A protein has these predicted regions:
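Bacterial signal peptide processing site
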Residues: 24-27
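A compositional/structural signature for long, glycine/proline-rich flexible linkers
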Residues: 30-426
């Protein structure tokens, strides 16, 4: 019996030694590391009403930013457990400009040996991944040793790198409730030298991500009756490069409501459908043009809609004198089998700066991982620049059939229209 215990103890010791993470030093030196939550920023919450540039309310973000120019001989290793969420990605940004230059989304992250990627195949239990961030100019021989499919590269000329994690709709492991960290610990960050020996992790320096905001400006077209939707260009505001956005903007009035109807993209119901889905997720998000923060949103599974059917979205000021009647009308329409979603915008709500969020709103229709080959995909449209010194978005339209969503996508493209209270209630 004693011999059996000794054998089992030795076997367990071997297994533990073999399962030490690949990012550890192979010459026996151990470098103390803080816990992952100490390595990453505090949670940047999409629904925290703090972040600018119209974030999605259903997404949490974390950043780790470091000086790439001062650590050009270091490889970063991110090792963690796949989170329990609808969508997960790692993006790399030039923190001096906000431009995205690399990244990897959940379904393309290889699972560690013995694990399964839960964004590819339905699975249970804990599943792990490893991602390496290598400096520009890293020899291919080093990349080959790491496994090229696990490597993301720092672009030439980028001096300061912001690594951002995104979790959409994170839950506990059993999916029963919302969870800030999607039921897992954040990935641990370690560092290797070019000989793949463990070395010190670069200092986490202050990032510009938390400070980002889109430009605040006025537009004459905000007063127009129609609010067209445009495809957003890839911007300098730390965008998710795996996401496409339609945007529109208008001034809400007390004597009318803003409405738009279209057929939303169908979404997959299980991981096995993710790869061939026309989009992973969609949401409608409403933000204030006065501070570029998001305040209201609804995502696919919470919206009133059905695949292949038109859904209607109505935005009404809280101070609209006919609000009660408008609410009753929407309830009646839904009772009659329509798919109508009502947003009540409180223009007098104070933001964190103590200012009212106002009556001018930006409306975003967001698609994650849109399939450009799908004939109704918003990603097929031609992007339209935001307001600049040459004019407003509507002034940048040179090809309406490719730039205006309702023309480019037909029933799958929204067009906002201000409808008088009386006409809406007829």
């Amino acid at each position: 019996m004693r011999i059996k215990q000794i054998i089992m103890t030795s076997l367990l010791s071997c297994i533990m030694a073999m399962t030490v993470i690949a990012c550890s030093d192979d010459d026996g030196k151990k470098i103390p590391a803080p816990s992952p939550k100490e390595q990453w920023s505090a949670t940047l919450k999409g629904d925290g009403e703090v972040l600018g540039a119209y974030p999605d309310l259903y997404c949490n973000y974390w950043e780790y930013t470091y000086r790439a120019d001062e650590n050009s001989d270091k490889i970063l290793c991110l090792k963690g457990e796949f989170p329990h969420c609808r969508y997960f990605s790692v993006s790399l940004y030039n923190d001096e400009t906000g431009d995205v230059f690399s990244g990897i989304n959940d379904q393309d992250i290889p699972a560690d040996k013995g694990s399964t990627n839960p964004f590819v195949k339905t699975t249970s239990g804990k599943n792990y991944f490893t991602i390496y961030v290598v400096p520009n100019g890293t020899p291919q021989s080093v990349i080959d040793k790491l496994g090229s499919e696990k490597v993301v590269k720092v672009a030439k000329g980028v001096n300061k790198v912001a690594i951002a994690l995104r979790h959409y709709l994170g839950t506990t492991a059993d999916g029963s409730q919302k969870d800030e960290y999607a039921g897992v610990e954040l990935p641990a960050i370690t560092a290797l030298d070019m000989d793949l020996h463990e070395t010190s992790v670069p200092e986490h320096v202050a990032s510009n991500i938390a400070k980002v905001t889109s430009k605040v400006f006025t537009q004459k077209s905000d007063e127009n009756k129609e609010m067209p939707f445009f495809l957003a260009p890839v911007s300098m505001y730390y965008p998710n490069s795996f996401t496409a956005y339609l945007y529109g903007r208008t001034h809400l009035r007390e004597d009318s409501v803003l409405t738009f109807s279209f057929i939303p993209a169908p979404v997959p119901t299980k991981p096995e459908e993710y790869k061939d889905a026309v989009t992973r997720y969609w949401s409608i998000c409403i933000g204030s043009a006065s501070d570029t923060r998001s305040y209201m949103s609804i995502y696919d599974k919470k919206a009133r809609y059905a695949d292949g059917k038109k859904a209607t979205f109505v935005i009404c000021l809280k101070k609209n004198p006919k609000l009660a009647a408008i609410q009753s009308k929407v309830n009646e329409m839904n009772a009659n089998g329509e798919y109508v979603n009502l947003f009540i915008w409180d223009s007098e709500k104070k933001n964190i700066d103590g200012n009212p969020i106002g009556e001018v709103v930006a409306v975003m229709y967001r698609n994650i991982l849109p399939d450009k080959d799908w004939e109704h995909s918003i990603a097929r449209m031609t992007p339209t620049a935001y307001k600049d010194d040459k004019g407003e978005p509507i002034d940048h339209v040179t090809d309406p059939d490719e730039q205006l969503a309702h023309k480019a996508l037909g029933d799958y493209g929204p067009l906002g229209v201000k409808v008088s209270n009386d006409d809406f209630l007829k």
